[in-house]
């Protein structure tokens, strides 16, 4: 995600709004706070697993997940300059899943940190988050690449970033591996039929980088940059096509 944003900045292509699910909501919220990919990169490269995950055995035995998610929420509060989504510099929405009813929930008002925590609450890993009267888990359960949400919020041209890894995994050794691999399969199936709605789809090569892998940040950043560079001709063409369509519509009205 960060590498893609960096290239958009370098190419002077403005980001009019950000809609994110799971880690996309985390990256998106930090960027929406100050529109600075270098600050975003610095934050990401300092980030370690212990900054986000408050694992407790008691949670796993008696709760609804291995981690409560309080560390993740505190991390967002410390890194995002604004408390509420309405205050962010870039219009922003996080996507979560209503665990009771299996419905997509768009969080575009209220606490930034709570919205990101809910959107990133991987089932079984993080406890569900009670927010705005709903019990919420990771948005990827129902919509891992929220193109429809961006369209509904008025996006004219949607650039979607798909960081899903290939589902093959022969190194499953424990219950956490089972949860993560099951989630990965679910996300992959979900993404497969949703991503076709994007004007431009960017697919960084992050195969082999797991959901909880914090050791390959530089590789992921470079993969995002390369994928965005590869997609740039398609993005430029899409921008010109939108401009031509608008010009034609205006001429027709005249």
Language-model segments: which ranges?
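Patatin-like phospholipase
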Residues: 1-21, 29-254
């Amino acid at each position: 995600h960060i590498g893609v944003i960096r290239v958009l900045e370098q190419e002077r292509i403005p980001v009019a709004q950000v809609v994110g699910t799971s880690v996309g909501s985390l990256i998106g919220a930090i960027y929406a706070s100050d529109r600075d990919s270098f600050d975003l990169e610095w934050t990401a490269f300092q980030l370690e697993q212990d900054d986000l995950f408050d694992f407790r055995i008691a949670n796993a035995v008696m709760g609804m997940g291995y981690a409560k998610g309080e560390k993740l929420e505190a991390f967002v509060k410390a890194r995002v300059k604004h408390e509420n989504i309405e205050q962010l510099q870039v219009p922003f929405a996080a996507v979560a899943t209503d665990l009771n009813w299996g419905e997509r929930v768009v969080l575009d008002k209220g606490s930034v940190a709570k919205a990101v925590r809910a959107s990133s609450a991987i089932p079984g890993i993080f406890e569900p988050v009670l927010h705005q009267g709903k019990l919420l888990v990771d948005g990827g359960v129902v919509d891992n690449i929220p193109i429809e949400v961006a369209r509904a919020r008025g996006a004219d041209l949607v650039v979607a970033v798909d960081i899903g890894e290939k589902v093959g995994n022969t190194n499953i050794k424990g219950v956490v591996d089972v949860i993560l691999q099951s989630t990965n399969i679910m996300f992959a199936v979900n993404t497969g039929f949703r991503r076709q709605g994007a004007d431009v789809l960017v697919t960084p090569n992050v195969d082999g980088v797991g959901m909880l892998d914090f050791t390959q940040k530089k590789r992921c950043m470079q993969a995002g940059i390369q994928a965005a560079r590869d997609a740039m001709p398609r993005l430029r063409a899409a921008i010109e096509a939108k401009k031509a369509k608008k010009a034609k519509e205006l001429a027709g009205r005249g």
